Amino acid sequence: MTSLRKTHPLLKIANSALIDLPTPSNISAWWNFGSLLGLCLASQIVTGLFLAMHYTSDISTAFSSVTHICRDVNYGWLVRNMHANGASFFFICLYTHIGRGLYYGSYLYKETWTVGVILLLLTMMTAFVGYVLPWGQMSFWGATVITNLLSAIPYAGQTLVQWIWGGFSVDNATLTRFFAFHFLLPFVIAAFTAIHLLFLHETGSNNPTGLNSDADKIPFHPYFSLKDLLGFTILILTLTSVALLTPNLLGDPDNFTPANPLVTPPHIKPEWYFLFAYAILRSIPNKLGGVLALLASVLILATVPFLQTSKQQALTFRPLTQLVFWTLIANIAILTWIGGMPVEYPFVSIGQLASLAYFSIFLIIIPTTGWLEDKTLKWSRT
């Protein structure tokens, strides 16, 4: 008799995606981060839902409602700390997942990769509107500065900014709509995740060699479901440790002060996971140029599949491009550091050089090394 999971209309979908899914036998721990992102998303939705039960999206009570959650609600402090630090862990997993995709050439599955880039943009947008909700100093000024960037759009810019604000400045209407977006977007992310998986299961997973693995595949369960469970355990332990022991490690002290439109913080900066893009934005003195560079810093990922020059998919057997890849990682770390520094010498110059290197690596250096490696191996693209 055929198992129910193989015949039932709903269980059949879950079975083909999570149980009987043919998976390359040699995928490493770098492939764990997709499922970890699913765990992060589920955790953020659950903790966010409990926070939304007690939060009020009104500028006169928003800050107080967050204080009330932490002081008076049963385990409210824990839910809030898990949610705030969960966002950081979400981005750690997200950037690692993208890094793995770049290293092993997963971007050659163009549909999956494009949906992934959309997911990245949606997650960044969700995190940005979420950061505004506690209505602290950095929340208010971050919202003001980032939304103001849209005024650089010729002709329609100023109108667009006021339309987003719902008035002539960041005010009550802005907070209310940001809360609405922050509540809605995670469900949009969940829907796009389903599309992401749909496209992935059309082609099957890549593997560390970058070679076809059809001849050597094993069922996802129990092998990789158990392997993912280990990843879940490590992530949950690390997240709870941070939430319980150093909950404010990754936050900004300015956000413990209620928003005041009359007092500007000495250094306006976003959360750590946006600092690399913020450094690129600041490295261009022109407002419109900076906004375009900021957009390009993320959207450049969408161009990667079209810049492939090597005949090999992964970087596993490509030492020259490996060196360039790790240079890119170091460069992003430098940009993250610069993004948190004041706008003064030598940080401005370092930021400009690092921004130039960032785009050069993607657009010029990696395609060149790919071509060079093929030449060295006397391979010609067919």
From Swiss-Prot:
Mention one GO biological process in which this protein takes part, according to its record. Answer: mitochondrial electron transport, ubiquinol to cytochrome c
Gene3D superfamilies under this entry?
Answer: Cytochrome Bc1 Complex, Chain C
Q: Which domain of life is it from?
A: Eukaryota
Which InterPro entries does the record associate with it? Cyt_b/b6_C, Cyt_b/b6_C_sf, Cyt_b/b6_N, Cytb/b6-like_sf, Cytochrome_b, Cytochrome_b_C_euk/bac, Cytochrome_b_N_euk/bac, Di-haem_cyt_TM
GO terms for MF:
metal ion binding; ubiquinol-cytochrome-c reductase activity
Q: How does it sit in the membrane?
A: Multi-pass membrane protein
Q: Provide the transmembrane region boundaries.
A: 33-53, 77-98, 113-133, 178-198, 226-246, 288-308, 320-340, 347-367
Keyword Transmembrane assigned: yes
Q: Provide a GO CC annotation, any one.
A: respiratory chain complex III
> Which parts of the sequence bind a ubiquinone?
H201
Location of the protein in the cell: Mitochondrion inner membrane
Q: Which UniProt keywords apply?
A: Electron transport, Heme, Iron, Membrane, Metal-binding, Mitochondrion, Mitochondrion inner membrane, Respiratory chain, Transmembrane, Transmembrane helix, Transport, Ubiquinone
Question: Which cofactor does the UniProt annotation name?
Answer: heme b
Comment on bound cofactor: Binds 2 heme b groups non-covalently.
User: Short name of one Pfam family for this protein?
Assistant: Cytochrom_B_C
Q: How does this polypeptide assemble, per the annotation?
A: The cytochrome bc1 complex contains 3 respiratory subunits (MT-CYB, CYC1 and UQCRFS1), 2 core proteins (UQCRC1 and UQCRC2) and probably 6 low-molecular weight proteins.
Instruction: Please give the family membership noted in the entry.
Output: Belongs to the cytochrome b family.
Protein's recorded name? Cytochrome b
From what organism does this protein derive? Sigmops gracilis
Phylogenetic classification of the source organism = Eukaryota, Metazoa, Chordata, Craniata, Vertebrata
